[in-house]
């Protein structure tokens, strides 16, 4: 084995189940993998540990961490061939960390399980949506973390997305969503709301998931839209409204132009809309490009039901 290539799909974070955590666990959440954009990392044999390409410095830092965590000796040359845009709500940091860790581990002949990958990459201690969409693709629901326990949240459910459901992404040119210390500080300022958490759980269990399982896009989309507003209300004191300032009008536009469901991924500013069929997707994408008027980009994507792909050369 002289090289390993890992391709990891982006993810849309659809919301948290319990933002502050009134029970024994905190956060919990759900999200879905999309086939574009993607992070593609290649690791090849080398005497030294080096990296090149977009986000090379971050990939190199991850490689150093995972070598120590997994007890890997020797070098590797890491090439970041493609990178998900950073801080727009598509999970760029997690996917880069997991893909780099998997590439370095596989090059060394190791096949760590998902929890070992997350631990070595230093990911998944708050939200495990990025981890489970990386491993499995599709739509995932995770159960939250116990306070003081440094372990990714357990996977509660995973379902494949229908092949004929399409997703339109609108990524406006705007201030990036929160990350790093600013994100950590934001979570300390949130307050518990048991009523909202109960409504979110009810919506996921009795409408969103049943709608997905029965391939009822109307039910799924309505539940998704309502879920996004409930979650957004919890974060409104932090982000200045139910959605990122640049995202609010775009969510309304998605719904007004025919999306069955729409919302903001993570802290934004990326907005997404779900439709049935490629033709409807192309039409919505064209109309959303007019809404952005050059102030960002729009992409029609498919849902990814496979998760990360690992190719050994």
Task: Please identify what each model-predicted range represents.
Residues 82-106, 126-134, 262-266:
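Glycine/serine-rich anion-binding loops at beta->alpha junctions
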Residues 34-35, 72, 255-256, 263-267:
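A structural signal for short secondary-structure junctions
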Residues 247, 265-272:
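Small/polar glycine-rich anion-binding or flexible loop at a beta-alpha turn
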Residues 1-88, 92, 105-114, 305-306, ...:
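ATP-binding N-lobe of GHMP and related small-molecule kinases
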Residues 17, 30-33, 91, 95, ...:
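Gly/Ser/Thr-rich beta-alpha loop segments that engage phosphate groups in nucleotides
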Residues 40-43, 259-265:
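Short, flexible, solvent-exposed loop/turn segments with mixed acidic/basic and small polar residues
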Residues 2-7, 15, 21-25, 113-257, ...:
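ATP-dependent small-molecule kinase catalytic core of the GHMP/sugar-kinase superfamily
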């Amino acid at each position: 084995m002289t090289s390993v290539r890992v391709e990891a799909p982006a993810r849309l974070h659809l919301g948290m189940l319990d933002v502050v955590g009134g029970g024994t666990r905190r956060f919990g959440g759900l999200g879905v993998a999309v086939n574009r954009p993607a992070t593609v990392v290649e690791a090849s044999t080398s005497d030294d540990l080096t990296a090149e390409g977009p986000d090379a410095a971050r990939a190199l830092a991850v490689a150093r961490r995972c070598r120590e965590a997994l007890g890997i000796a020797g070098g590797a040359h890491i090439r970041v061939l493609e990178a998900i845009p950073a801080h727009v709500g598509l999970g760029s940091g997690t996917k880069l960390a997991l893909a780099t860790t998997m590439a370095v581990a596989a090059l060394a002949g190791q096949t760590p399980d998902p929890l070992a990958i997350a631990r070595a990459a230093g990911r998944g201690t708050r939200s495990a949506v990025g981890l489970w969409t990386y491993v499995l693709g599709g739509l995932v629901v995770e159960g939250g973390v116990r306070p003081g326990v440094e372990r990714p949240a357990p996977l509660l459910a995973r379902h494949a997305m229908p092949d004929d459901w399409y997703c339109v992404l609108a990524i406006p040119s705007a201030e990036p969503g929160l990350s790093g210390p600013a994100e950590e500080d934001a979570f300390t300022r949130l307050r518990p709301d048991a009523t909202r958490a109960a409504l979110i759980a009810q919506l996921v269990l009795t409408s969103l998931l049943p709608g997905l399982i029965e391939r009822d896009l109307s039910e799924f989309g309505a539940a998704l839209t309502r879920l996004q507003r409930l979650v957004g209300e919890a974060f409104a004191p932090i982000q200045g409204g139910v959605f990122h300032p640049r995202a609010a009008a775009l969510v309304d536009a998605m719904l007004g132009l025919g999306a069955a469901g729409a919302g903001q991924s993570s802290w934004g500013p990326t907005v997404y809309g779900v439709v049935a069929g490629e033709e409807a997707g192309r039409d919505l994408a064209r109309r959303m490009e007019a809404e952005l008027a050059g102030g960002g980009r729009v992409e029609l994507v498919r849902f990814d039901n496979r998760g990360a792909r690992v190719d050994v050369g």
